Amino acid sequence: MKMSALFPIFGLPLLFCNSFAAELKATGRGCGGLMDGCDGKSTFCCSGFNCSPTWKWCVYARPGRR
């Protein structure tokens, strides 16, 4: 009984993550979204995001950000 309850709890999120990763790979997006790694030289952030110099990942672009 416990195992049959755990299967949907852990199995379905794994299935969704796997399908999401496959879709991302298929689109071949050339820019990074929120919290994707970037360096500003070879990898860039998409529109609406900036590459954080401290953390080296894409963050939301805010007006007045230094």
UniProtKB/Swiss-Prot annotation:
The main location class comes to: secreted
What's a single GO CC term here?
Answer: extracellular region
- Disulfide bond entries: 31-46, 38-51, 45-58
Q: Where in the cell is it found?
A: Secreted
Q: Which residues form the propeptide?
A: 22-29
Q: Which UniProt keywords apply?
A: Amidation, Disulfide bond, Ion channel impairing toxin, Knottin, Secreted, Signal, Toxin
Please explain the role this protein plays, according to its UniProt record.
Probable ion channel inhibitor.
Q: What is known of its domains?
A: The presence of a 'disulfide through disulfide knot' structurally defines this protein as a knottin.
Protein name per UniProt: U1-theraphotoxin-Cg1d 2
